[in-house]
A protein has these predicted regions:
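Short, solvent-exposed turn/loop segments enriched in Gly/Ser/Thr/Pro and often Arg
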Residues: 1-2, 52-57, 161-167, 173-175, ...
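Active-site segment of extracytoplasmic enzymes that catalyze sulfate/phosphate-ester chemistry
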Residues: 1-13
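Active-site-proximal cap/lid insertion segments
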Residues: 11-21, 36-206, 218-226, 278, ...
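C-terminal cap/loop subdomain of S1 sulfatases and analogous C-terminal strand-loop tails that border
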Residues: 18, 39, 165-171, 197, ...
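Alpha-helical elements of Rossmann-like donor-binding domains used by nucleotide-donor carbohydrate transfer enzymes
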Residues: 26, 30-33, 143, 210, ...
Length: 358
């Protein structure tokens, strides 16, 4: 709330219905109105706008025409699969292979029209709803950018497009974001602005907390000592490919305080030390997952080689596209990644201790 007080103007409303009164269009309208007001200002000061949309987010109540475009129905799925609905993701599973600690979280069992279902029909319908919401947001962003161009300030403005997290919607048998697979940990990140070469891509290796120091450097503002992030301004300008060699992930909600991940190069380790969530005789779940993301970018598991799953995904995984943690051939790699993870946990002051962590 304190940060919000630093803005000269603030408009705050959250609505995930499919109307234009206070949904995505309302958010875009407020920014467009601000640009219109700036046209009349004689002594314009540099501006910063933070625009956060209500969608996409469950319940994914898309607009009727867009739902029809993506073969989806609201709120519940149709009686049979609509051929226009998006196909299931390549790493779809009908259930997660092991209890991972959050049996009652809303994202996993209370999403409107989904609940506990992970059928092909349900997931394809939910993907269609998600696409409908995303396209509506995309349209509203287009309106904002057009208004910025009309204001004459587009060429001198840095634009950051991103999100707070990804989402599963059927991937690995999950629905929400409370996991450390790539589909939920990674986020979209697109930047445009002066001296940023168009249509280029960089590895980056950044955290969202790196955005603040980057904005400070771009604006010529001294980066506060309290900021933990690293500016990736040189990455934006093509002078560097990345600012971090290691990425550390943690999730501590529900019954799973012990879910951590580490990434370096092509290798990624996810480590679970959680309770299974059972209300009678709960048990520990201790699992390692080791992936080579270059060879297995979708983090496919042995369960993805099930004939029933392949019949739905239409994808035949390669033999080595599995969790490699139990393979003796990769014992040394697992140990190196564990050592790196434990080192990073100590560096950031993570109080949790895994079963084999000294």
């Amino acid at each position: 709330e304190g940060a919000n007080l630093l803005f000269d103007e603030r408009y705050d409303k959250t609505n995930r219905e499919n109307n234009d009164l206070d949904g995505n269009k309302w958010h875009a309208d407020k920014v467009i109105e601000y640009f219109e007001k700036r046209k009349t200002e004689l002594n314009k000061k540099p501006f910063m706008v933070f625009l956060g949309f209500s969608h996409p987010h469950d319940p994914r109540r898309g607009k009727k025409k867009l739902l029809e475009k993506y073969g989806a129905s609201n709120p519940d799925p149709p009686k049979k699969i609509n051929s226009k609905s998006p196909v299931v993701p390549i790493n779809y599973l009908p259930s997660h292979p092991f209890p991972y600690g959050d049996p009652d979280i809303r994202d996993e069992n209370s999403v409107e029209g989904v609940y506990l279902s992970r059928s092909e029909l349900t997931i394809r319908n939910e993907k269609g709803k998600d696409f409908a919401c995303i396209e509506d947001m995309d349209f509203q962003i287009g309106r904002v950018l057009e208004a910025l161009k009309e204001s004459g300030e587009y060429e001198n403005t840095y634009i950051f497009f991103t999100s707070d997290h990804g989402i599963a919607i059927g991937k690995h048998g999950l629905m929400g974001k409370q996991n450390l697979y790539e589909h939920s940990w990674k986020i979209p990140f697109v930047v445009s602005g002066p001296e940023i070469k168009k249509n280029t891509e960089a590895k980056g290796n950044i955290y969202l907390l790196d955005v603040l120091p980057t904005l400070c450097e771009i604006a010529g503002i001294t980066i506060p000592e309290t900021v933990d992030g690293i500016s990736f301004n040189k990455v934006l300008r093509g002078k560097k490919n990345k600012v971090r060699n290691v990425l550390y992930g943690a999730y501590s909600g529900g019954f799973k305080p012990g879910m951590r991940s580490i990434k370096k190069g092509n290798w990624k380790l996810i480590k679970y030390d959680v309770m299974d969530g059972a209300f009678t005789m709960p048990r520990k779940v201790q699992v390692n997952q080791l992936f080579n993301l270059n060879k297995n970018p979708n983090e496919l598991l042995i369960e993805h080689q099930n004939e029933g799953v392949i019949a739905i995904t239409k994808n035949m995984p390669k033999k080595n596209q599995i969790n490699l943690a139990e393979n003796p051939k990769y014992k040394s790699r697992l140990q190196k990644m564990e050592k790196l993870l434990f080192s990073e946990m100590e560096k950031v002051g993570d109080p949790f201790k895994f079963w084999n962590q000294k």
